[in-house]
């Protein structure tokens, strides 16, 4: 199924191994793809190193749940703690495009409150940036992907979307009916980064249901189709099937490049004036810990002891309801209706922060697994449930689990195929988390019943790993500053979901890409100072650049006035 870049006819610049590039980006996913494009368009020499393959969307992506297994990071990891996370297909992507290849493409923004959780609610942490700092990049990325959604989105910072919403499927109808019966506001038709009209050479969504299998038709946005092609056109290089093993620190206290293994297990060293880590919430801290060296014996850029700590996952329970009439939840994008009415802290609750309720659309194999988990169905019992698939609807709750110091990534004694220590992930729910999840499950089940379900069951699960290299103003309690530069090393940056201090109850994909665009603007604004100076310009705002080529987003079908 998988083919390396060498078998894909994609012209690109090739840097010689001895050449020193301006930026080496580790991981070409949601953040890495945006960074690669921005920096290449600004004229920098940039190489992206990706552990997975460079996907050929026609050859490698299939309308089949089992056949999409290799889209995910399924290499060994160790999981533990009192509430261990299931690591693998639900959390991490592998290959160019990263998690944006298999995301469902829900793209809500974080709320203004998410950036000052500690100040407002006395829990979690504040971000070193505000909603206003990232708002222009939300708007920019919503056009670039583009995002389809309602004309008015009422929660957080109210706003609308330039591209009209998708039609409702059966699951959306059930959510609307349930919310309406309980007087709960609901958003219809998005926001979702799936085309509701033709867009350049990308077609309208055909509502086939295989969104998290890569989207063979190209209607769903991923950086593989939205940003990487332009990056290559502007001189970037991507080396796929290259596993970065260590970031090298020079005697002058600055990084000099990265060591990596190719597909044959041969070792290489890519020299770089600056390095950006975009490997996400497990692989980025794992790489920093594996890069321990004299002066940083407990992990590179880890003078605070914070690398790997404050890992977060959202509560992602799936509530399923059976309806007398067919629902056919595979029709329409899985992500097409939601409510964030319970997102913010309510003083009447016995917990801080909140949750969202969204439509989801598990395909038959995933549905079967959920029936096993929720109803202990097996054998003929499972067969009966599977035969009833068209009558079931599924809602997913997204609950904000707070950042806790003991939820962390460390190194295991186990080794991967390259001999590198694999990640050990320890996760624990605290009392606030448990109370929030209990309330969220009860509310989601109530909405399902109000929507007309005659039977309701639920599966406990988690979604969306973030944190473990948090950003902050204090070098004693965080890993990077507000622009993603590590506090300890002036030419080493982290830009991915691992920098989140808190996570809200919104899917993180849009925020990850918006942060990448903001970091890129900062790097471009600073220019060669990034490569030569240890001084940090924290006062100058990044100059916002409309670097996305108009031809990539200007030909869509805008909302009718």
Predicted segments with their positions:
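Conserved redox-cofactor binding core of oxidoreductases
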Residues: 83, 118-244, 465, 470
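N-terminal Rossmann-like FAD-binding beta1-loop-alpha1 element of flavoenzymes
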Residues: 23-48
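A conserved FAD-binding loop/helix module that cradles the flavin
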Residues: 502-521
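Redox-cofactor-proximal catalytic regions of oxidoreductases
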Residues: 67-155, 345, 405
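FAD cofactor-binding and catalytic pocket of flavoenzymes
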Residues: 84-90, 127-131, 304-423, 477, ...
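A glycine-rich dinucleotide-binding beta-alpha-beta segment and adjacent secondary-structure elements
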Residues: 20, 188-195, 203-211, 218, ...
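Extreme N-terminal leader/targeting segments of oxidoreductases
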Residues: 1-23, 41-42, 525-561
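Glycine-rich loop(s) and the adjacent beta-strand/alpha-helix scaffold that form part
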Residues: 38-41, 45, 52-62, 217, ...
């Amino acid at each position: 199924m998988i083919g390396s870049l060498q078998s894909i006819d994609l012209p690109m610049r090739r840097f010689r191994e001895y050449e020193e590039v301006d930026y080496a980006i580790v991981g070409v996913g949601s953040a890495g793809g945006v960074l690669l494009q921005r920096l290449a368009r600004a004229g920098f020499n940039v190489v992206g190193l990706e552990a997975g393959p460079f996907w050929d969307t026609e050859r490698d992506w299939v309308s089949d749940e089992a056949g999409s297994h290799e889209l995910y990071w399924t290499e060994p990891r160790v999981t533990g703690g009192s509430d261990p996370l299931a690591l693998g297909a639900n959390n991490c992507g592998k290959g160019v495009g990263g998690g944006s290849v298999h995301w469902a493409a829900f793209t809500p923004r974080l709320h203004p409150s998410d950036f000052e959780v500690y100040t407002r609610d006395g829990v979690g942490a504040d971000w070193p940036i505000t909603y206003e700092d990232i708002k222009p990049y939300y708007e920019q990325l919503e056009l670039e992907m583009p995002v389809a959604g309602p004309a008015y989105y009422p929660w957080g910072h109210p706003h609308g979307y330039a591209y009209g919403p998708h039609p409702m499927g059966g699951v959306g109808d059930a959510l609307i009916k349930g919310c309406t019966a309980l007087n709960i506001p609901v958003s219809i038709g998005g926001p979702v980064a799936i085309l509701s009209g033709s867009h350049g050479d990308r077609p309208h969504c055909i509502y086939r249901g295989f969104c998290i299998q890569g989207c063979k038709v190209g209607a769903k946005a991923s950086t593989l189709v939205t940003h990487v092609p332009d990056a290559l056109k502007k001189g970037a290089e991507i080396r796929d099937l290259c596993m970065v093993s260590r970031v090298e620190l020079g005697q002058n206290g600055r990084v000099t490049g990265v060591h990596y293994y190719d597909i044959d297990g041969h070792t290489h060293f890519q020299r770089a004036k600056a390095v950006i880590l975009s490997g996400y919430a497990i692989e980025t801290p794992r790489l920093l810990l594996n890069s321990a060296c004299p002066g940083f014996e407990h992990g590179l850029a880890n003078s605070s002891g914070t690398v790997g700590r404050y890992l977060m996952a959202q509560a992602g329970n799936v509530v399923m309801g059976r309806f007398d009439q067919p629902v056919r939840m595979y029709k329409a994008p899985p992500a097409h209706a939601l409510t964030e009415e319970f997102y913010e802290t309510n003083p009447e609750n016995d917990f801080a922060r909140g949750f969202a309720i969204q439509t989801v659309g598990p395909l038959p194999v995933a549905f079967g697994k959920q029936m096993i988990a929720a109803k202990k169905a097996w054998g003929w019992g499972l067969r009966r449930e599977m035969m009833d698939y068209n009558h079931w609807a599924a809602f997913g709750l997204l609950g904000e689990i707070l950042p806790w110091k003991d939820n962390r990534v460390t190194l295991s004694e186990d080794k991967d195929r390259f001999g590198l220590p694999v990640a050990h992930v320890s996760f624990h729910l605290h009392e606030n988390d448990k109370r929030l999840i209990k309330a969220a499950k009860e509310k989601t089940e109530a909405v399902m019943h109000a929507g007309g379900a005659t039977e309701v069951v639920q599966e406990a699960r988690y979604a969306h790993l973030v944190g473990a290299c948090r950003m902050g103003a204090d070098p004693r309690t965080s890993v990077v500053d507000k622009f993603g530069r590590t506090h300890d090393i002036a030419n080493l940056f982290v830009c991915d979901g691992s920098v989140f201090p808190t996570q809200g109850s919104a899917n993180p994909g849009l925020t990850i890409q918006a942060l990448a665009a903001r970091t890129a603007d900062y790097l471009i604004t600073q220019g060669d100072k990034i490569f030569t100076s240890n001084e940090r310009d924290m006062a100058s705002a990044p100059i916002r650049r409309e670097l996305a080529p108009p031809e990539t987003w200007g030909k869509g079908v805008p909302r009718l006035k």
